[in-house]
From Swiss-Prot:
Subunit details: Self-assembles into homopentamers. The capsid has an icosahedral symmetry and consists of 72 capsomers, with each capsomer being a pentamer of L1. Interacts with the minor capsid protein L2; this interaction is necessary for viral genome encapsidation. Interacts with protein E2; this interaction enhances E2-dependent replication and transcription activation.
Membership in a protein family: Belongs to the papillomaviridae L1 protein family.
Record gene name: L1
Protein name: Major capsid protein L1
An example Gene Ontology biological process: endocytosis involved in viral entry into host cell
Segments of this protein annotated with the region Disordered: 479-502
Originating organism: Human papillomavirus 35
Biased composition (Basic residues): 493-502
Length: 502
């Protein structure tokens, strides 16, 4: 007798087809038309540690400007489809659209090299654990001291057409069964946020939210004790499918430890008893050790700024195409973080020096200059290309004025005679609603280059460097050759008539 048995072998189904992300070089055609665009001198001045607010209101009188902040420039470019070209025969407006490709960039930095320091008048520093020459007794109620230090040295430059992403450790959410009680360590969570202009960089104390994770406001210096220090999430930006966040980046970091201290306060997690042999004192010193960072010497031999960089091949699928006519340049430079001391005299009549006769102020100034070389590119709008761009970013097609055209209306419309009369409804058409900026909730340093494009590359320093490395020559504006002879003036010939005898 035969019995039916189910097939116990594993059945493998074919994988579902997934759309493939392709490089922009497969549907973008580059032309031999290049433009130079550059910003004006970009300056910022403020207090290096905190913002100063007005006494009568909550408005900021002096902003916080520190050498330890991110500078995120949002560079706005003109729409090439509305650009005035001398010759438009190189593309078809009916079936093609124009885009910009960033091929060269130079971030200029002014001001001298210098090391900026920070500190806290009441830093939670208990003992010197590096060169301890005494037995530690019981700590008092308040052992905070005035300590200053220099920070980790960082030079960074990120280029992309979307805002960069940063990471930091923040306060997580516990499970319902594990509620955090007062005084217990909260759970940590790695958070991703957009890097905005004015965010603090990693200074050597970690990329974390000091506002929620350090309640005493004394474990770190003043400029970060109520801030969030962020670190660029290179792993997330590099793995972004379309490669819009990061075309390429330049990075240089260095740090060493200058001093070793420990912190006052009750140690929340005591040292296990099997890790040491008890002594006669009966109490252990604080094991909350921490170092003071230092970035060491700054030198012009290790600078990544004030140099041209040429983009031949990006790290992602986007090979420098500036979608939505914008570009994001993120800069960090702690090698020019000098804090200037400004002294003002209260009274000039005293001849004897007194400390109370003078007021001390701190200011930090920054200077930037952005220069670009853009290449004009064209995209042929086939059905496959438009479908791919729509799946990538539908707003690109909206900016190109692609959409469904409504059919002509066949209904009878009303037309009033006295349009200004108060007896009839208002006949004024409503203004079209402006397009919302998807990045309006973020803070960037806006740089408008819509009227800064020039085809005369040889008139700019970065343009001349580009012509040299590309092997191109500028078109001469005048002809060189033999000078033309001056026009000769005709003179009247004085001839005498002969008399003819009759």
């Amino acid at each position: 007798m035969s019995l039916w048995r189910s097939n116990e072998a594993t059945v493998y189904l074919p994988p579902v087809s997934v759309s493939k992300v392709v490089s922009t070089d497969e549907y973008v055609t580059r032309t031999n038309i290049y433009y130079h665009a550059g910003s004006s001198r970009l300056l910022a001045v403020g207090h290096p540690y905190y913002a100063i607010k007005k006494q009568d209101s909550n408005k900021i009188a002096v902003p916080k400007v520190s050498g330890l902040q991110y500078r995120v420039f949002r560079v706005k470019l003109p729409d090439p489809n509305k650009f005035g070209f001398p010759d438009t025969s190189f593309y078809d407006p009916a079936s093609q659209r124009l885009v910009w490709a960033c091929t060269g960039v130079e971030v200029g930095r002014g001001q001298p090299l210098g090391v900026g320091i920070s500190g806290h008048p009441l830093l939670n520093k208990l003992d010197d654990t590096e060169n301890s020459n005494k037995y530690v007794g019981n700590s008092g109620t308040d052992n905070r001291e005035c300590i200053s230090m220099d920070y980790k040295q960082t030079q960074l430059c990120l280029i992309g057409c979307r805002p960069p992403i940063g990471e930091h450790w923040g306060k997580g959410t516990p499970c319902n069964a594990n509620q955090v009680k007062a005084g217990e360590c909260p759970p940590l969570e790695l958070l991703n946020t957009v890097l905005q202009d004015g965010d603090m960089v990693d200074t050597g104390f970690g990329a974390m939210d000091f506002t929620t994770l350090q309640a005493n406001k004394s474990d770190v210096p003043l400029d970060i004790c109520s801030s969030i220090c962020k670190y660029p999430d290179y792993l997330k930006m590099v793995s972004e499918p379309y490669g819009d966040m990061l075309f390429f980046y330049l990075r240089r970091e260095q740090m060493f430890v200058r001093h070793l201290f420990n912190r006052a306060g009750t140690v929340g997690e005591t040292v296990p008893a099997d890790l040491y042999i008890k002594g006669t004192t009966g109490t252990l010193p604080s094991t909350s050790y921490f170092p003071t960072p230092s970035g060491s010497m700054v030198t012009s031999d290790a600078q990544i700024f004030n140099k041209p960089y040429w983009l031949q091949r990006a790290q992602g699928h986007n090979n420098g195409i500036c979608w939505s006519n914008q570009l994001f340049v993120t800069v960090v430079d702690t090698t020019r973080s000098t804090n200037m001391s400004v002294c003002s005299a209260v009274s000039s009549s005293d001849s004897t020096y007194k400390n109370d006769n003078f007021k001390e102020y701190l200011r930090h100034g920054e200077e930037y200059d952005l220069q670009f070389i853009f290449q004009l590119c064209k995209i042929t709008l086939t059905a496959d290309v438009m479908t791919y761009i729509h799946s990538m970013n539908p707003s690109i097609l909206e900016d190109w004025n692609f959409g469904l055209t409504p059919p002509p209306s066949g209904t009878l419309e009303d037309t009033y005679r006295y349009v200004t009369s108060q007896a009839v409804t208002c006949q004024k058409p409503s203004a079209p609603k402006p397009k919302d900026d998807p990045l309006k909730n973020y803070t960037f340093w806006e740089v408008d280059l819509k009227e800064k494009f020039s085809a005369d590359l040889d008139q700019f320093p970065l343009g001349r460097k580009f012509l040299l490395q590309a092997g191109l020559k500028a078109r001469p504006n005048f002809r060189l050759g033999k000078r033309a002879a001056p026009a000769s003036t005709s003179k009247k010939s004085s001839t005498k008539r002969r008399k003819v005898k009759s």
